[in-house]
Amino acid sequence: MHKILLVDDDRELTSLLKELLEMEGFSVIIAYDGEQALTLLDSTIDLLLLDIMMPKKNGIDTLKEIRRQYQIPVIMLTARGSDLDRVLGLELGADDYLPKQFNDRELVARI
C-alpha cells in the first residue's frame, strides 16, 4: 500500500481527501503545517501532497527543506493557482501543481 503524507491546514479538506485517497487504496498521514510535515516525513512516504499557505512553515519553505534531504514526489495542492505560482512551485522542485477546486478523479490520476 502506498503511503501519502497530506500537508494542509484546512482540516475539513484534509478529512475529505483522506477519505477519498483511502477509498482508492492509499494509506494517508496528515500534517497540518510544514513543521509537523518535516517531523513525520521519512523514507516510507511515497508521495507528498503539499499546500502552500499554512501557519508556522509555509509550503514553499517546507518544499525547499524536503528537497535538501529527499527525492520524494511532491504535488502542490493550493489555492494559489496563478501561472507564476505554478512555475515557482515547479522550479523549487515540485513534481506537479494542482490548484484547489480540483476534480477528485484528476487528483487520483495525477497520483
Listing of model-derived features with the role each one plays in the protein:
Residues 39, 58-71:
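Short amphipathic alpha-helix used as the core "switch/output" element in two-component signaling
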